[in-house]
């Protein structure tokens, strides 16, 4: 009943498709000869392929079942004993009561009956005397003594410390949905982890595929179809040999007044201290042809990014009648041609400089090129994730995963810059991998690079022989936000492992990680700790966005950690606090979504920094939406389930009405973005399905252009079709641009090649915070 590919086990649950068969399809209708005369060949094909009379490749699951989306129901006949009495097995599938065709309401009732029947069969398989105890089976919770109850703090909200009786030491074995989901289509194969928002929504919609088929013709709209991009992204991975030479590329650099304006905007708006680059920039104009080709690529990347930023600030990519003026299409086209020209030159410089070998300016140019490719990206390409992989590999090749203190030939200044670059790469890797639902590339066990220090750029330079001690975190420096985010992500990587690893983890590990999330959140610098909008009235909008983003990260980690305890197979009371923590975190994120939406309007506190927001939060907003959709749908199913026992009741009451109100507000926000966002249309489809008649049919917001204008972004969620229900919505290119949220882009000194005169001396951008 799911697209997830799960390991084959001895206790399989028949799928809905296998229930909806006639009695002639079963194998038990044929009379069988006595055991003494029986010489049947062993059945090597799965049951489904045998019924369809097609060749089976005997995999677990087989390719035929996987291609049809029935991987979890791919079953093989049990081995029959050769002597003695045959083992008693259930081979006949109970028929679906009533006719197979009827109204939508009747079909919905039958689906609900099937869900109850399947859960009953699962319980029967797990508790039957002839079957082995399943690792998914949970014994009844042990009673908690008064002493244990008194020792448990009664803290409400997502910051509660979850404390339970000693049974928390047993393993929480992964369920089939914990292994993630694989989608096999003619266009390719895609995988997302179980913690991805699309996989969560897919768990709601798997049994409703027939609704998508009935409404498919009605829901498809040609107005959503957008032409494909001219080039696949990232272009660097698809570029062929370069016909240009370094001399011809340098000759194509615009006149200095043009470049001066571009770099001025780049440094001022993107928060980069230009001191280190300025010296090299002056040297470049003295002898342009003497500059390393990789530095020229760095220059073109900065020029390209500055032009894209101008597009974002002026809104050249989209007309805006609400702003009281019109924009010339020719102006937008000319600006885009300039962007493409600068980007092409940066790619040529990377290729001519043999970027895979590493060296001075390589990582800086690759990182800025990555941002250029993602700046107006409508639909996250998996190639972008592969580009991040290239950046990680080049960094490891150059030894960035090892702390510079191990190597005496690296100066203190260069070593600190390397730490800043590595910190940015770690954040980039975690962000992109998480939003794509894929494993991260950097393994903590293989790195020992220290955190960068909390220092101002003026605290040290290339002549420094010993780094000063880190400033107290009460002082705001360009690296303070990076440090705060790194500490949250240090817990985040552990949470991701527990949530997605196929091996079981004890519930005590879950509780310990929950405690670590609370500690990391409490340890955030006071200047970056979110305590409500009322305490942020006298701080810059950039700081407000940083505070909100750190709070969203902390709540997102709570969701990923506790999400699996929302599943029907884990409804025991001793998991009630996990469910409460997960739902509370999701509700807080949607409250922040509403706040960000309100404050990015023309009269809001975040209006001047709205370009920094873009879709930096999009993946976590979608994750929270999917969690509350799952909760609301599960609550509706529980109301129909008369067999629910008291031990399965929630440990803490859930305010369903508040959840419904949050989802209605979220529906309004997502609906305004449907014209350009595929992910928004998926969210709207799920919300309208779950909310039903209570879903608000919103009208376009008068400030829609403010939210949908292109802005820099670097990592958005992508999943090519998470369930058959979503196929009823035509989902073209994604329109919410991705963002690098709060990463810094320092360029560092590298003394790896002292033969390159002043070009190998200083290569330093200091800070570039693109979303906060």
Curated annotation (Swiss-Prot):
Entry keyword annotation includes DNA-binding: yes
Localization annotation: Nucleus
Keyword Zinc among record annotations: yes
CDD domains: fungal_TF_MHR, GAL4
Sequence ranges of Low complexity compositional bias: 77-91
Chief location bin: nucleus
Cross-referenced Pfam families: Fungal_trans (PF04082), Zn_clus (PF00172)
Name this protein carries in UniProt: Pyrrolocin cluster transcription factor fsdR
Source organism: Fungal sp. (strain NRRL 50135)
Organism phylogeny: Eukaryota, Fungi
